[in-house]
Amino acid sequence: MGIKGLTKLLADNAPDSMKEQKFESYFGRKIAIDASMSIYSFLVVVGRTGTDMLTNDAGEVTSHLIGMFNRTIRVLEAGLKPVYVFDGKPPEMKGGELAKRLARREEAVESLATAKLEGNEADMEKYSKRTVKVTKQHNEDCRKLLRLMGVPVVEAPSEAEAECASLCKTGKVYAVASEDMDSLTFGSTRFLRHLMEPVSRKLPVMEFDMNKVLEGLSLTMDQFVDLCILCGCDYIDTIRGIGAQTALKLIRQHGSLEKILENLNKDRYQIPDPWPYEEARRLFKEPLVTQAEDVPDFKWTAPDAEGLIKFLVEENGFNHDRVQTAIKKIQLAKNKSSQGRFVNCLCRL
C-alpha cells in the first residue's frame, strides 16, 4: 500500500522536492531496487493476454523471468548499476495488511469465476490481475537469473524498502527505486519512481529529495514519520476522516502523534482501538536491516553465458538466439559502464 496520498501531498506542498529525470541521467549510479515490487509488476503486465500468462513447456509461469531479464538489460545498457533487494520475513505488525491483501485476492478469485461464467472478458482480465501473488519460487527464479547476469542481489532480513533505504542512507547506493512511497518514510535520501516502468509507457523517472521534502513541508524527520503513519501505512489502520492534507495540518499544529491524540475531537474522529502507533513509528525509525559494516562491496561481474542458456533456454523454453543476443548486450553494457567510469576518473584528474 505504501503511504496513502503522499505523492499528491508533496506535489501540492513541497513541489521542489520532486523532479522529472531522464532514465539515462543515472549513468554510473548504484541504484537499490525493490525486487518484489518489480516482480509483481512483471507478473501483472508482461506477456499477458486476457487471463493467460506466459509459461514454459511445463506450464510454469515465466512472465517474471522475461520481465526481469529484459528490464535489467535496459538498466545496464543505460549505464546504471542495479542492486536488487529481496524481502525477508515481514514484521508481525504487517500481518493485518497482509491479511487484507489475501482477502482481496480471494474476493478477486470469486469475481473472476463469476466473470468467466458471464463471459465478460474485460472483467476477466481485471480480476485475473488482482489474483497475482509473488511466490517464493518467483523470488528464487529471479535471484538465480540476476546472479547469472552478474548483478548483485541482497537478501533483506525483513522489509526490502527498509533495507534499500539503509543502503542509501549509508552511501552504499546513490538512490532507491520502488513504487512504494514508504521508501521515504524509512529515510531514503533519494528516491526514484517509474525507473522500472516499461518503455512503452513513456514515463519519466520521478526523483524525490528527502531533504527538500522536509524543507518543503516544514517538518523534522520524526514529524514526517508521524505524518506518514497518520496518512495511512501498512502497519496500522487509519483514523477515518483524516486524509493526507488534514494529517499535515494536524502535525504542523501539534508536532507529534501524542499531542494530536490529546487534542483530537473524539466525537468527530474515531481512533481505532488498539492503535499501536508507537510500534509503527519504531518500525520506520529502527527497522531490522543489515548493519552497514556487514554489507559487502557490490560487484557487477560478467554474465555466465553457459548458465543463462541452461536456465533460460533449456529449463524455461526461451528462444536460444534471443538469449544469445541478450547476453552480448549485457557484455557490451558492462564494458560501456566500465569505460564510462574510467573517463570520469580521468576528467577528475
From Swiss-Prot:
Pfam families: XPG_I, XPG_N. It comes from the Eukaryota. Mg(2+) 2 binds at D180, D182, D234. Its EC number is 3.1.-.-. InterPro entries: 5-3_exonuclease, 5-3_exonuclease_C_sf, Flap_endonuc, HhH2, PIN-like_dom_sf, XPG-I_dom, XPG/Rad2, XPG_CS. DNA binds at R71, E159, G232, D234. Its main location: nucleus. It is found in: Nucleus, Nucleolus; Nucleus, Nucleoplasm; Mitochondrion. This is Flap endonuclease 1-B. It comes from Physcomitrium patens (Spreading-leaved earth moss). The gene is FEN1-B.
